[in-house]
Each structure stands twice: as C-alpha cells, then as structure tokens.
C-alpha cells in the first residue's frame, strides 16, 4: 500500500540573493554555479505536513517500515554523470514567501539569511 504526502510548502534560497525569496516559483533549484569569482549556491526547502501520519499508522490505515522521497529532474543541464543530493531535516519553522525567481523576487519569507521575513 502507498500513502502519498505532497509538500505543504517549498522554496529555493540563493547565496547570491541572500535576502530575496522565491517561494511561489514553480521550479525548485539545487545547484552550485561558478562564474569567475562568483559562486552562487541554491538550496531547496520542502515541508511535509506529517500531523495526520500517527493516527493513520495507529488505525492501521497505513502500515510502513520505510519512507521514500521521490525527486524528479526536469530539463537538467550541465549535470555531472554522477552526483549526490543530501537531504537534511530542518529544526525550525520557516516561511515560504511569495517571490518568483526573476519576475517577482520579494523579500518576504525565507531567504539565505532569514527563516522568516527579517528574523534569523
């Protein structure tokens, strides 16, 4: 049996745009770009609401011994033949924000420097 959880919020944060947010962008980015002296790192944050999972497990509606995250690439470019993605839990809350990558970058929500608008 499969039980699917979809993300309740997501955003990409960029080291070179350290106070800008792209929470409404349709693309999540994970990258390192080197151009001369410029180094731009992109990280994606994804939140899954797990609040209903304990009741589903205790009722028997969901039985599981493992969980998987499936990530799909769309139109990747310049990716090495072998690479690894490292996934880490986030220990504090963060805000998604309403920015998009190039058209509507905003300073609300999570950024490289802040987990919510202006708060570290």
PLM feature spans:
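A short beta-strand-loop element at or near the start of a globular domain
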Residues: 1-6, 11-78
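Beta-strand-rich interaction/scaffold domains
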Residues: 76-120
């Amino acid at each position: 049996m499969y039980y699917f959880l979809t993300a309740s919020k997501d955003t990409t944060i960029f080291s070179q745009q350290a106070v800008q947010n792209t929470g409404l962008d349709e693309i999540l980015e994970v990258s390192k770009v080197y151009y001369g002296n410029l180094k731009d790192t992109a990280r994606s944050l994804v939140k899954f609401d797990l609040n209903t999972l304990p009741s589903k497990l205790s009722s028997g509606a969901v039985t599981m011994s493992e969980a998987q995250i499936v990530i799909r690439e769309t139109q990747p470019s310049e990716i090495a033949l072998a690479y690894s993605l490292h996934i880490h839990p986030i220990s504090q809350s963060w805000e998604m924000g309403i920015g998009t990558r190039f058209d509507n970058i905003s300073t609300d929500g999570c950024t490289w420097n802040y987990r919510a608008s202006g708060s570290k």
